[in-house]
Amino acid sequence: MKKLLLATLFAVSAASANVAMADGWPLSIVGNWSIIGNQHAGSLVIATQSAVGHCRRITGTIYPGTAVSHPIEGFYCPFSGRLQFVRKLPANNDTLQVWTGNVSQDGVVDRMGGTFTSVSTALGGGSLGEYNFQGAK
């Protein structure tokens, strides 16, 4: 009976170990990402990411060095890969777009993808509606 109990506990532990290691998203997404948002290629620079919390605050710039360069602010959840940020006008902090997506599990090339919603047509906000995006770093 003792051997059967130990064998059962070992099997449950082994199965649980695989589940616990199933996550694997990057702990940090700070850096320069090559992105395409609705056929517009450019860069997303994530400059900062907070160090604590299930979801962590991020800041940066989208399309830096271009006429449509804007600051971004949002969050990244390294335990689920979820990502969301808003693209803002620097002059008045108004939101132009809301980007929502997921980061792939950690790999040689990290990838992200999702949709963005354009909520303003001001200064690079584009046409109102929802569009796709993808990125790699």
Predicted regions: what is each one?
Residues 1-4:
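Positively charged n-region of N-terminal signal peptides that target proteins for export
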Residues 6-7, 91:
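General helical structural elements
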Residues 7-15:
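Bacterial N-terminal signal peptides
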Residues 15-16, 128:
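Low-complexity, intrinsically disordered or weakly predicted helical/coil tracts enriched
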Residues 16-22:
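Sec/Tat signal peptide C-region and signal peptidase I cleavage site
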Residues 23-107, 113-137:
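Central antiparallel beta-sheet cores of small beta-barrel/beta-sandwich binding domains
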